[in-house]
Amino acid sequence: MPGMPPVDSLSIIAGGWANHQGLLTRALHDLTPEQLGLRTAPQQWAVWQLAGHMAGSRAYWFHDWLGEGDASVRDLFRVEQTTVPDLPLEDAGWEDDEDRPRTASELVEGLAVTWDLIHACLMRWTPDDLTANFTRRRSNGERTVERGWVVWHVLEHDIHHGGEISQILGCYGLPPLDV
């Protein structure tokens, strides 16, 4: 088909994901602190927490698991304290410190930095590269995952939480992601 990338490329995935990234960052860009604090229920995460969680999870999976990118990308999402009882600080991210809500600018930048990392990987990797295995030791044992699983997991995670953000915005009469 004309205009289609070669079969050995991940650019089809990268293109669709880039579109979702753009929809998300445009939806967040001009939100006020009050709008970023909107949530569906008191016990649910606010818009800023969902977006921060998305960005931090990207850094966690691509850096900590796959060894991609500079440590500064991962460190961007670390916090000095958490408001979540019994959550170890090394496992905490932006979303876990409700005393420090993130701004639209911080969220858009965090999503941009992590998207740049993901996009560079997708442009470099081939489908065969997705079969590589990665193992991490944690306090509860070892876990092994395939690179392709990580790509899929982070993509589905983005779509899921992006949908939550879109729904929250729409429920409050704000423009949702224009999917």
Locate the predicted segments by residue:
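Short, contiguous alpha-helical
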Residues: L10, A14-L28, Q35-D91, T135-V179
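Glycine-rich, flexible loop/turn motifs
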Residues: T32-E34, V73, T126, L130
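Charged, low-complexity, helix/coiled-coil-prone segments
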Residues: M1-G3, Q43-W61, W94-L111
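Acidic/histidine-rich alpha-helical segments that form the ligand environment
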Residues: D86-N133, W149-H157
